[in-house]
A protein has these predicted regions:
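Short, solvent-exposed turn/loop segments enriched in Gly/Ser/Thr/Pro and often Arg
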Residues: 80, 117-122, 143-145, 150, ...
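N-terminal secretory signal peptides and thylakoid transit peptides that target proteins
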Residues: 4-24
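Contiguous beta-strand/loop segments that form the cofactor/metal-binding neighborhood of enzyme cores
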Residues: 178, 190, 195-461, 467-513
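A structured beta-alpha segment of the ubiquitous adenosine-cofactor-binding alpha/beta core
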Residues: 95-111, 116
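Conserved acidic residues
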Residues: 74, 112, 192
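Beta-strand-loop-alpha-helix segment that lines the small-molecule cofactor/substrate pocket
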Residues: 119-120, 124-172, 186
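N-terminal Rossmann-like dinucleotide-binding module
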Residues: 23-91, 170-173, 183, 279
Length: 513
């Protein structure tokens, strides 16, 4: 347990089964087992990193902004000048590229680390090219689009000894650690069932036709955007009125790609790395025995469905019993779960209208940046909200529920606002003594690792196995029936069609390494 800091470890009922639980298990879903980087010749904590970014618009802009206050941004790459315009203006003097391969070649000596924030289908190749050149990488979630790519990146991180982090910010949050420590302390007994839900997709899914071909905008390099994926005509879809995009843009990009089999991983790929972060850490989840999509609506030959329910069956892990995890997406409201008291708030908390952004459900926008470690449950705020129901604003339904033999715990989207159910149990509740190292914030965690510090909390030793089991659910959306998985052979034992989706195909002229 070298990677963990034990503070005031109590030898009371809170940790009655902790020793046997943690023996050999915690690093699997905590901070990983990568050796310290201090002797690897990396920059000292007082030196600034030279960071490049593959992707400059959209989510990449906030990743870059989170690193810019303390580090140097030295190169930017984006295939879409329109999407990247605001970031390019902010960093006017920084070299700009459209092809990430050219950027890595031209700027090799100037770059220490790279942010990879592009559509899912390009994560694997881009991260691999960076690591092969000795660059530390911060890769947005999901780590990859396929299981094979996730395993390749894990092996590369070990081989090239670079600092890594997946962009599932909730893994750094205080609440994620709180729920792990509560469960390890036996607060709700044995956990054999977990439910997790999201309102995503907030982009089109389940479409059944593709609009006619249109000219490619001058600002977009369509060939580079497609990357490893098969060539297809560009279309905006704007004139049909059938393809809504809440964030502007075109039929495939810059945002709708998440819903397509060839480019994204649907709602599960978008949000599971956040919402299921707390279950992954607390329950030490590894490969499931089986996965099955047990319900789906609005299906398509080339897109993920509009709504789905997926069931994962995990075997026993050490002294932890088998657990069944249910994933719901396309939710308009929180699923009704047996045993939850009527009117109980699950997942993300509401907040008081006019109460400012510091309320339970409304964090400041800047809080998502460098040192943010999440919103915590506050009993006084909870009481105040219960007294003024007419002034409450409810966020979209997102969250998770742990069902134990002695009680329940719920968490929000990013492992925040951890609390027992019913929440009245929190009035005089004292959390267990901290066992896990606290994060300085997801970006600082990675930057520290790049400078020789301890491995980041969602380094690829953690992120790759997490991504792998999540991606099995993505495959289950495309194949009917229960899929039985052999992690040693990396294959489904009862469905050859499903095995086709474990590894990507590469368009001619594109190579993974």
């Amino acid at each position: 347990l070298r990677e963990y800091t034990t503070l005031a470890l109590e030898t009371n009922r809170r940790h009655f089964f902790l020793g046997s639980l943690l023996a050999g298990a915690v690093p699997a879903a905590g901070f990983g087992s990568t050796p310290s980087l201090k002797l690897a010749g990396y920059k000292s904590p007082n030196e600034k990193l030279n960071i490049a970014s593959i992707g400059a618009g959209g989510k990449a802009s906030s990743d870059i902004a989170a690193c810019a206050p303390t580090e140097n941004i030295v190169a930017l790459c984006d295939v879409d000048d329109r999407q990247a315009a605001a970031t390019y203006k902010r960093f006017e003097s920084v070299p700009k590229y459209k092809d990430f391969r050219r950027m890595l070649d031209k700027e090799d000596k100037n770059i220490d680390a790279v942010i990879v924030c592009t559509p899912d289908h390009m994560h694997g190749m881009q991260a691999m090219w960076c690591m092969e050149r000795g660059k530390h990488v911060y890769v947005q979630k999901p780590l990859t689009r396929t299981v094979w790519e996730a395993r390749q990146l894990l092996e590369a991180a070990r081989k090239y000894k670079v600092a890594t982090q997946m962009g599932n910010q909730g893994y750094s949050n205080e609440g994620t650690r709180q729920v792990a420590e509560m469960i390890w302390a036996g607060e709700i007994g044995e956990v054999r069932e977990v439910h997790a839900w999201t309102d995503r997709p907030i982009w089109p899914q389940g479409l059944t036709s593709i609009p006619p071909e249109e000219p490619v905008p001058d600002t977009l390099d369509w060939d580079l955007w497609l990357g490893i994926a098969d060539m297809r005509p560009f279309t905006s879809g704007k004139d049909t009125g059938k393809y809504p995009n809440r964030f502007g843009g075109y039929f495939y990009q810059p945002f709708n790609w998440r819903g397509f089999y060839d480019f994204g991983c649907g709602a599960l790929g978008d949000m599971a790395c956040h919402i299921l972060g707390a279950p992954n850490m607390a329950l030490q989840l590894g490969p499931p025995k089986s996965v099955e999509c047990i319900k789906k609506e609005g299906t398509s030959p080339f897109m993920f469905p509009e709504r789905s329910v997926i069931r994962f069956e995990f075997p026993a892990r050490g002294n932890m019993p088998p657990v069944t995890l249910y994933w719901y997406d396309g939710c308009k409201e929180t699923p009704r779960i047996e045993g939850v008291p009527e009117g109980e708030w699950l997942g993300d908390m509401p907040f008081l209208m006019g109460g400012g952004q510091g309320q339970q459900g409304g964090p400041p926008r800047q809080a998502q940046r460098t040192g943010y470690v999440g919103r915590l449950f506050d009993w006084e705020q909870y009481e105040a909200m219960r007294k003024e129901p007419d002034k409450l604003r409810f966020p979209p339904p997102d969250g998770a529920l742990f069902v134990g033999s002695k009680g329940m715990i719920t968490t929000g989207t990013y492992g925040e606002q951890t609390r027992l159910i019913p929440a009245e149990k929190m009035k005089d509740y004292r959390f267990p003594a901290p066992l896990l190292t606290r994060s300085p914030g997801h970006y600082r965690d990675w930057i520290r690792a790049c400078k020789g510090g301890e491995p980041a909390c969602s380094n690829f030793e953690v992120a790759a196995p997490f991504t792998e089991w999540m991606l099995l659910g993505v495959i289950a959306l495309r194949v009917e029936g229960k899929l039985e998985y052999d992690p040693v052979k990396m294959r489904f034992t009862n469905n050859n069609e499903a095995n086709k989706y474990l590894k990507p195909t590469f368009r001619k002229g594109w190579s993974f390494a």
